[in-house]
Amino acid sequence: MKINFFNSTLLAGLMISAVACKQASKPAQETTTKTDSAKTIVAKVADTSNTADVFNNYIGLKNQFLRSNMKGIKSTAAMLEDKLAGIKGCTETATLAHQIATSDDIKAQREAFLILNKDIIGLIKGSKFKSAPIYVDFCPMADNGKGGYWLSVNKAIENPYFPEHMKTCGQVKEQIN
């Protein structure tokens, strides 16, 4: 019953995550909007003040998945959830991190991580966050052969989806920065 509930929640999260972090994943730019009083307001899109913290916690989480370290996965996901909650538009992505932090099933955690990666990649690509090169990696075997992405700071492939059996399965698809 718990697994079915979690899978249902995960499926709902997948649908919702398509729009999660949407505001934060767009490049910062000025937009204008008209109010009822016909005044023009200039607003900044994408508050990326916590993006570096999110990225550092994300890399920590990915590294815990490489070790299949349940305790480390839970604690790092909780820290990531906290940082995501501080970014406007990332509520659903924070919920995915919460699901990872509270689950006792590593397979379910990896499924949530698969979805979370889509939002984190969008957030990093759309932000002004700069670091050493960041690589978007891809494993064609993840997600039952549909494939899955993750971020890395190393060019060498270290697959967080199959660290025990196919640690080097995958390829670099893109370099950010």
PLM regions with names:
Residues 1-10:
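Bacterial N-terminal signal peptides that target proteins for export
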Residues 6-7, 116, 122-129, 153-158:
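Short, intrinsically disordered, charge-biased short linear motifs at domain edges
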Residues 17-20:
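C-terminal motif of bacterial Sec signal peptides marking the signal peptidase cleavage site
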Residues 22-25:
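Bacterial signal peptide processing site
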Residues 30-53:
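Post-signal peptide N-terminal segment of mature Sec-exported envelope proteins
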Residues 49, 56, 60-82, 86-95, ...:
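Surface-exposed, polar/charged faces of alpha-helical domains
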Residues 113-120, 139:
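Small-residue-enriched alpha-helical segments and adjacent helix-cap loops
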Residues 131-177:
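Amphipathic, charged alpha-helical segments and their helix-to-coil junctions
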